[in-house]
């Protein structure tokens, strides 16, 4: 399930949680994303190492011999639906590690152990984090670090649904500017319009709570 910001992906997930009769687990790649989705992190739930996962690992390998409690094993064996939010940030090897774990406790012959998988996110937002040292290993198994290179996912025939209507912004002209920037198609019209809004020397009143965006964490820390 995909769509640009403001199209209702998070709202859909909330409604799904409220109304689905399925036993559902909601995961996300980071702590902040997990809090926003009302779930936990992928690494926490499956107790997966942050080290790269080699997709040719066997089920008996120490790499996937996680010590789960009986309660966790019961949850894994009984879940009907696994939801992964902010899927754009999930690396292909992490998704294959999830697949290996689910196959171990569910059905070894089916991708993700036969569990229904719902991935939610926008590929034009945050990308997966992969260090050069990690990619030097993973590039032997994947064309790209993005989740869609997952070997398990390529064994499935999945459906893609895109939410198109933006509910967060009613100004159609401003929305068209944002979309051009999003698609790397910013032309002179876009740049001129944005530059007209620039106010040199503007000092926001503290009581109005303006948000200041910076390019680096240390700059944000200095401001704060």
Name each region found by the language model.
Residues 1-224:
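Conserved ATP-binding/catalytic motifs of P-loop helicase motor domains
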């Amino acid at each position: 399930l995909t769509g640009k910001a403001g199209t209702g992906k998070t709202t859909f997930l909330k409604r799904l949680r409220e109304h689905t009769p399925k036993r559902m687990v909601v995961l996300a790649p980071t702590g902040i994303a997990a809090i926003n989705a009302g779930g936990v992190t992928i690494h926490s739930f499956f107790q997966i190492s942050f080290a790269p996962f080699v997709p040719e690992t066997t089920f008996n390998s120490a790499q996937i011999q996680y010590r789960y409690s009986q309660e966790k094993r019961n949850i894994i064996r009984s879940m009907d639906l696994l939801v992964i939010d902010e899927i754009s940030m999930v690396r292909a090897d992490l998704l294959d590690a999830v697949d290996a774990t689910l196959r171990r406790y569910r059905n070894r012959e089916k991708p993700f152990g036969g569990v229904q998988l719902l991935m939610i996110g926008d590929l034009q937002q945050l990308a997966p984090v992969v260090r050069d040292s990690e990619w030097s290993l993973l590039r032997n198994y994947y064309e790209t670090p993005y989740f869609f290179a997952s070997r398990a996912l390529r064994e499935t025939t999945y459906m893609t649904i895109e939410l198109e209507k933006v509910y967060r912004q009613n100004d159609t002209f401003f929305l068209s500017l944002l979309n051009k920037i999003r698609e790397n198609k910013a032309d002179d019209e876009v740049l001129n319009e944005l530059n007209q809004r620039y106010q040199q020397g503007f000092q926001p009143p503290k009581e109005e709570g303006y948000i200041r965006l910076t390019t680096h964490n240390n700059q944000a820390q200095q401001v704060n």
